[in-house]
Amino acid sequence: MTPKEIRELAPAELPTKIRELREQLLQLKLRKQTGQVEKTHELRSLRKDIARLETALTASKKKAAA
């Protein structure tokens, strides 16, 4: 997910998107435990995307409070 895509998301959509990515991460972790994942780099990219979205969510909350 690119920074531009993150900025284009509405603040109300951020928690939903974070939840979706966390579910994907959970599924990927479970598949990794069973040895079904070939692209292990996806775990890292999902974690980073979640962090980026959480950062954007925090920034939007601070902006709304100010």
Swiss-Prot record:
Taxon lineage: Bacteria, Pseudomonadati, Verrucomicrobiota, Opitutia, Opitutales
Keywords associated with the record: Ribonucleoprotein, Ribosomal protein
Matching SUPFAM superfamilies: Ribosomal protein L29 (L29p)
Organism superkingdom: Bacteria
One Pfam family this sequence matches: Ribosomal_L29
Organism expressing this protein natively: Opitutus terrae (strain DSM 11246 / JCM 15787 / PB90-1)
Family, similarity comment: Belongs to the universal ribosomal protein uL29 family.
GO biological process assignments: translation
Extent of the signal sequence: none
Full protein name: Large ribosomal subunit protein uL29
InterPro entries: Ribosomal_uL29, Ribosomal_uL29_CS, Ribosomal_uL29_sf
MF terms (GO), sorted A to Z: structural constituent of ribosome
CC per GO annotation: ribonucleoprotein complex; ribosome
